[in-house]
Amino acid sequence: MSLRKIIHIDMDAFYASVELREQPHLKGRPVVVAWEGARSVICAASYEARQFGLHSAMSVATVKRLCPQAVYVPPHFDLYRQVSAQIHAVFRRYTDLIEPLSLDEAYLDVTRNFKNIPYAGEVAKEIRAAIFAETGLTASAGIAPNKFLAKIASDWRKPNGQFVLPPHKVMAFLETLPLGKIPGAGKVTLKKMQSLGMRTAGDLRRFERGELLNHFGRYGYRLYDLARGTDEHPVKAERERLQISTEITLPEDLPLGQAAGHLPHLAEDLWRQITRKNVEAQSVTLKLKTYDFRIITRTLTYSSVLPDCAALLQAAQMLMARVPPQTEDAFRLIGIGVGRLVPKNQQQDLWA
């Protein structure tokens, strides 16, 4: 078992919490972050809203049925990025091995941290306290020997808590861990696991690698390792990007049509980034991740730059139409990105 000290930091209901910080009169009410419209999906739900069964990626139509009193707040992605930058500034006081997963979560390798604190749990406690002091927002943390276990642990004491999983307790922890807690184990995978008599990671561990490959394809390799608490993937420090992108991990696996409901707000977010960086783009890429971690990408390249957000959304929707609507596929992530970047005004303002 690795002796690394990995922290997974996950902000609590991040988008909704930022909005509640800005509009404190809404505290205690079921708040959802979304553009109000019958065809929209929500970006986030406050903990009060979650008590009604609301969650991100749910359609506004469903929200209205489950919680007619929900308060709708439009998303402010520039503000979320600003707050995320504050949070990352806190991380950098302790380590430069930071792997962002999104605006509101990241892995940190604190095995050798700048403050020479021997206990990763103390590092996590200090980081969470600093985040709260500087942003007014709470974070949860999981501390473990690898990324897989740290991510599971961060969900254990949510919200505003942390859970330390030391190496000598990993096997006992996994023995009773519900399979639904395994990252990437969506509805399709879980249904197959249950049909094989699996209920916990301990049950999964009793299957040989070949059996798992037979039942789950190449995802079986990953399952075999995860059932034994093994994950050698390093924390990858953020590198300068050659493209600009935005994506969302869905709280549950969704069919293609429902996943496509996220394209409008993803396009809005991405266009804000393009505008802020003062660049223009000539290619658009759609990214989808299936329940079994297969990556599907589609790309369009134009002879001139994208003129506006509507053109970006249209391109993303065209790419979505190129994905075969395989009914057995469920998607757990959707994202769009732009490439072939040039400084603004360098290209002719034409749309091909």
UniProtKB/Swiss-Prot annotation:
Organism: Neisseria gonorrhoeae (strain ATCC 700825 / FA 1090)
Compartment annotation: Cytoplasm
Designated name of the protein: DNA polymerase IV
Subunit: Monomer.
SUPFAM superfamilies per the UniProt record, alphabetical: DNA/RNA polymerases, Lesion bypass DNA polymerase (Y-family), little finger domain
Keywords assigned by UniProt, alphabetized: Cytoplasm, DNA damage, DNA repair, DNA replication, DNA-binding, DNA-directed DNA polymerase, Magnesium, Metal-binding, Mutator protein, Nucleotidyltransferase, Transferase
UniProt remark on cofactor binding: Binds 2 magnesium ions per subunit.
A GO molecular-function annotation: damaged DNA binding
Enzyme class at the top of the EC tree: transferase
Catalytic-site annotation from UniProt: 105
